[in-house]
């Protein structure tokens, strides 16, 4: 894989299931879905948000706990139940004055393909499906739900000299 230029990135957008989770969905005794997320991913998400990056989730799934978890990390741009991720991306770009080259979108499966082709830096976890890996400019060494989100955020912040700043020491 060629050297990746993370310097223009101002925006991180993620799918949720399979990126921030390992893709496993548990159900409680009433049938409500439960998903596990990674604390190290959470640390990186809250730091990026605190440092002023745009951080968003665009997910096809409807899961109220996704919104609660992301909001607890300072991520307020959480869009769930989105059937057309490209349309939502275009709306988000227009509302925030963003250009494709500023954006990383990390996805893991077929529903993410089209939206990933609309950003400057398509990315995926190590365990993404082959079709997603084929179009990704960055493939994390970490699988979904096991540090892939942290990996990509950390790489961007390091390139932009924002990784070990004073803000990094407080959560």
Residue ranges: model-predicted function:
Residues 1-2, 162:
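N-terminal charge/polar-biased segments
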Residues 34, 71-72, 77-78, 86-171:
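Mg2+-dependent phosphoryl-transfer enzymes with acidic/Ser/Thr/Gly-rich catalytic loops
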């Amino acid at each position: 894989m060629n050297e990746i230029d993370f310097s223009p990135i101002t925006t991180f957008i993620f799918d949720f299931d399979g990126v921030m989770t390992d893709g496993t969905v548990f159900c409680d005794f009433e049938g409500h879905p439960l998903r596990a997320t990674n604390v190290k991913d959470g640390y990186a998400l809250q730091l990026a948000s605190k440092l002023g990056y745009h951080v968003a989730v665009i997910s096809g799934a409807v899961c109220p706990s996704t919104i609660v978890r992301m909001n607890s990390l300072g991520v307020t741009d959480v869009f769930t139940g989105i059937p057309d991720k490209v349309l939502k991306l275009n709306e988000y770009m227009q509302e925030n004055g963003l250009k494709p080259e500023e954006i990383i979108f990390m996805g893991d499966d077929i529903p993410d393909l089209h939206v990933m082709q609309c950003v400057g830096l398509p990315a995926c976890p190590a365990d993404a499906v082959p079709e997603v890996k084929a179009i990704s400019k960055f493939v994390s060494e970490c699988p979904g739900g096991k540090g892939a989100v942290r990996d990509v955020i950390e790489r961007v912040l390091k390139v932009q000299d924002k990784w070990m700043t004073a803000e990094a020491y407080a959560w």
